[in-house]
């Protein structure tokens, strides 16, 4: 029996308060309004940005259903939707693409002015929620909200992908993989034969390593305090691995000595302020490019000597690897299907939604690269 136009009751992981576990609840998901799409989520990844909300370092209205990296199937569409139809495989886009605003029209920008990123309203574009639980409205997250069996998104926040693609794998393209891979090939524009350093070797850092390798870097140095990650980093393309705890000097000095003055490209992936400065300092002073990838804590600022940049270093940043969601995500899925890069090595656990708290525990303990939740 068709569910189009009807309220759907389903399971979702609700975060009622910060620093509390997720609670599996029955929620009601309203049908999509005009220019909205209701999606049955098949698989969703647990991202460190979700945990930043749990611990309060990223602020968004609560209670909320988090999750922003997923793959699913369109269940129904609202009036006026033309880019997807029921039955399509899709990836929700936490960085939307309306195609009409100034940012969308600029070839080097991917931050649509209609996105919830940075505003954290916790609603869809009309200022309301499609979720209720126990009679209370539940907030959305980044306009996508994927820790739920069903979700509703704006049409500008979803893109159709290859019908043959495995959603439990390509869901990673919805955030972490694209963020790391794009930071190397699209934002940093790693040059063939160059020397690169990836500061931190979690899932996004490993994706940056994959990107550096794809771009033809001659040396790729993985930096992490967890030596257990080094084997995977080398499997995916790192030529050397460095643990800062093995040295009695700043890690940027170690990297400068290893590379005759500094790397050509560096990628800071963890989001710590001190590692952002180290990643910049380890670059070659006349031409090195450092890309900020990791999400920094709220309400904190960096202090650096301007002469560090005056000599010729460049400091760049981008969200979602600089990719325009509707334009680029289907291409990335096609590239995965053509075996141009792997996703399987990044997935360490596949859990049902009921084990979401176990997945977050593994993330916090540094014992997983990516945990995928299935419904």
From Swiss-Prot:
Enzyme Commission designation: 1.1.1.1
PROSITE patterns documented for this protein: ADH_ZINC
Organism: Geomys attwateri (Attwater's pocket gopher)
Essential cofactor(s): Zn(2+)
EC class (word): oxidoreductase
Main location: cytoplasm
Keyword Cytoplasm: yes
Keywords (A to Z) from UniProt: Acetylation, Cytoplasm, Metal-binding, NAD, Oxidoreductase, Zinc
Gene (name only): ADH1
Family, similarity comment: Belongs to the zinc-containing alcohol dehydrogenase family. Class-I subfamily.
Residues annotated to bind NAD(+): 200-205, 224, 229, 293-295, 370
Reactions listed under catalytic activity: a primary alcohol + NAD(+) = an aldehyde + NADH + H(+); a secondary alcohol + NAD(+) = a ketone + NADH + H(+)
Residues found modified as N6-succinyllysine: 234, 340
InterPro entries membership: ADH-like_C, ADH-like_N, ADH_Zn_CS, GroES-like_sf, NAD(P)-bd_dom_sf, PKS_ER
Taxonomic path: Eukaryota, Metazoa, Chordata, Craniata, Vertebrata
Subcellular location(s) of the protein: Cytoplasm
Listed name of the protein: Alcohol dehydrogenase 1
Top-level lineage group: Eukaryota
GO molecular function, one term: zinc ion binding
Disulfide bonding pattern of the chain: none
One CC-aspect GO term: cytosol
Assembly with partners or alone: Homodimer.
Coiled-coil regions, chain positions: none
Modified residues (N-acetylserine): 2
